[in-house]
Amino acid sequence: FMGLVGSEMCIRDSFNLIDDRGNEFLPDQFKGKWNILFFGFTYCPDICPLTMKQLSDVKEALSENSNKMRVFLVSVDPDRDKPENLRIYLNNFDDEFQGLTGEIDQIYKFSTQVNAPFFPVVNSKEPNYTVDHSGSLVVINPEAQYAGFFRAPHDTNKISKALASLLN
């Protein structure tokens, strides 16, 4: 776990996203629990489903402590990842996982503040395009501050242990 301190933790620029139920999502909504974010997309053939499965395993390993955290998939492909698509996709892993999407510029503004870069694809004519994105898991603390990240490849046991110490 790469933890951060001080001014690195600020999410300086506000952003406005849409959750998987079609409601507005603002940075303050991260408050109250630890938040694990993965920036990916539902059409991703490999790293995204693997990572979401790993997060499901981590949540299971944390058992009763898992109610102190939330898991989010932040879409880097809003052209295809509409709120209802995110909800259906996430239900394959855990029905408590939450999806965020929105305007590409808002997603990009957020992703760059939390070291989860991606290369936006806009209005692609190719139906099966992919999006190059970070494999890191972003950690947002209960004060809605960027707290650090887990770099890929992910070890479910190490992540579970690190999160267990954060959640206690």
PLM-predicted stretches and their roles:
Residues L50-F110:
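Structural microenvironment flanking redox-active thiols in thiol-disulfide oxidoreductases
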Residues R12-D13, N35, S134-S136:
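Short loop/turn microsegments at loop-to-beta-strand junctions
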Residues Q106-A162:
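Thiol/disulfide oxidoreductase modules built on the thioredoxin-like
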Residues N16-L17, V139:
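Hydrophobic beta-strand positions
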Residues F1-G6, C10-I11:
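Single conserved hydrophobic/aromatic residue that forms the stacking wall/gate
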Residues T42, V74-D79, I104, N115-A116, ...:
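Solvent-exposed coil/turn segments that connect beta secondary-structure elements
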Residues F25-T51, L55:
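Short active-site neighborhood of thiol/selenol oxidoreductases, capturing the structured segment around
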Residues D20-R21, P142:
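Short, ordered coil/turn segments that flank beta-strands lining enzyme active or ligand-binding pockets
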